[in-house]
Amino acid sequence: LKRTYQALSSLIEETKMEIIHLDSIATSLDIATSESDLSQIKEELMEYGYIKKHYDRRKGQKAQSKSKPFHYVTEDGYDIYVGKNNFQNDELTFKFATGNDWWFHAKKMAGSHVVVKSKDGELPDHIFEIAGQLAAYYSKGRTAPKVEIDYIQKKQVKKPAGAKPGFVVYYTNYSLMA
């Protein structure tokens, strides 16, 4: 009975992580704007075994172009980037953003990673508001009147070993309502 309990506890935890991952994919589908966005989502679904891989017999065909994160430039010149799917979120957070850039995400729900390129480590208050609004809009809570947004400098955001795309951990964060 004890071993059964341990095995079931482990399976329940794995299933919870799968649900979180699939929830983030569903949110990515909600905000996809192009065929290349959908292709990246399909690629992730195939990579993790949710759908079967279909091999293209037509050789020598051009690879589909990768979709890119949304890019916004504020009136005062701050660059804000928004990942549209889990692969983009990983790339944006761990390959593109630098340590002093600011990272935003909807608290405890699936959504896009939002990165504000920092000019000197600090941002004006209105940039925090804009980035928070983008993180709220590109999240599962996009239709809610208010969404709690966590934000922190990118150097405080970590990816656990073996974690699925888009999954991160962070601790000493700030929060705002957007």
Which role does the model predict for each range below?
Residues 13-79:
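Coiled-coil termination/hinge junctions
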